[in-house]
C-alpha cells in the first residue's frame, strides 16, 4: 500500500534535505506573485471556496475549481497566523507548481515545479529571505 503525504510537507522536506544547487549569479533576481495570489485571506472572495479550519474567524484555506470540479488554484495558511503561506497552481486538475512562504514573512521563498503532479522537476529557494533566488536544483526528466 502506498501512503501519500500532503504535498507541501513532503516537498519542503525534500528541499531541506537536498544539497548543492546553482549559484545566485546564474539565477533571475525574483519571481513576482501571480495576479491571483494574496497573503491576505480577505482577497479570496468571488469564485473561491473558503474555509476557516480552526474557527477563529479568519479564512485559512481557499480553493478555486473549474466547471468540471478540478482544482485550478489553492491557497492555505498552514501556521494559522492570518496570512496565506502556501500556494498551489493546477493545470487540468494536475498540480504544476507550489510556492511557499516558509518563514511566514509574506514573501515567497520556495518555488517547486512538478511534472505530472508528483515528480519534482526543479525547485528554487531564497535562502536568506531577501527576495532574490539563491539556490536552484533541477532534475532530469525520466523516461516513462
Q: What role is predicted for each listed range?
A:
Residues 1-9:
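Bacterial N-terminal signal peptides that target proteins for export
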Residues 3-4, 18-22:
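N-terminal targeting/docking segments
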Residues 8-18:
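Bacterial N-terminal signal peptides
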Residues 20-144:
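Calcium-binding acidic motifs and repeat modules
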Amino acid at each position: 500500500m502506498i501512503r501519500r503525504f500532503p504535498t507541501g510537507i513532503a516537498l519542503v522536506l525534500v528541499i531541506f534535505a537536498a544539497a548543492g544547487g546553482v549559484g545566485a549569479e546564474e539565477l533571475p533576481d525574483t519571481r513576482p506573485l501571480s495576479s491571483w495570489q494574496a497573503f491576505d485571506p480577505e482577497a479570496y472572495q468571488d469564485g473561491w471556496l473558503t474555509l476557516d479550519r480552526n474557527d477563529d474567524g479568519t479564512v485559512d484555506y481557499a480553493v478555486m475549481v473549474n466547471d468540471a470540479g478540478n482544482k485550478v488554484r489553492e491557497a492555505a495558511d498552514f501556521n494559522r497566523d492570518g496570512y496565506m503561506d502556501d500556494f498551489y497552481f493546477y493545470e487540468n486538475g494536475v498540480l504544476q507548481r507550489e510556492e511557499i512562504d516558509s518563514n511566514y514573512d509574506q514573501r515567497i521563498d520556495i518555488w517547486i515545479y512538478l511534472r505530472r503532479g508528483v515528480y519534482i522537476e526543479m525547485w528554487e529557494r531564497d535562502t536568506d529571505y531577501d527576495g532574490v533566488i539563491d539556490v536552484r536544483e533541477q532534475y532530469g526528466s525520466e523516461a516513462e
